[in-house]
Amino acid sequence: MLCAHFSDQGPAHLTTSKSAFLSNKKTSTLKHLLGETRSDGSACNSGISGGRGRKIP
């Protein structure tokens, strides 16, 4: 969901984030439950929004 939040970058990024999210959905969910969304968010958003995901508290 963190990747989808930055879908404002354009349809190309939306497709990329969607593919990445679907591929790592289980991993992302586990990390979210473990409170590691910051690490997952940075890695995911770094390639989609140029690292803006690092602003996630």
From Swiss-Prot:
Location in or out of the cell: Nucleus
One GO term describing the cellular component: nucleoplasm
Transmembrane helix is among the record's keywords: no
Keywords, alphabetical: Nucleus
Tissue expression as described in the entry: Highly expressed in prostate, rectum, and distal colon, and weakly expressed in bladder. Expressed in prostate cancer cell lines.
Spans annotated as Disordered: 38-57
Protein name per the record: Small nuclear protein PRAC1
Naturally occurring in which organism (per UniProt): Homo sapiens
Organism ancestry: Eukaryota, Metazoa, Chordata, Craniata, Vertebrata
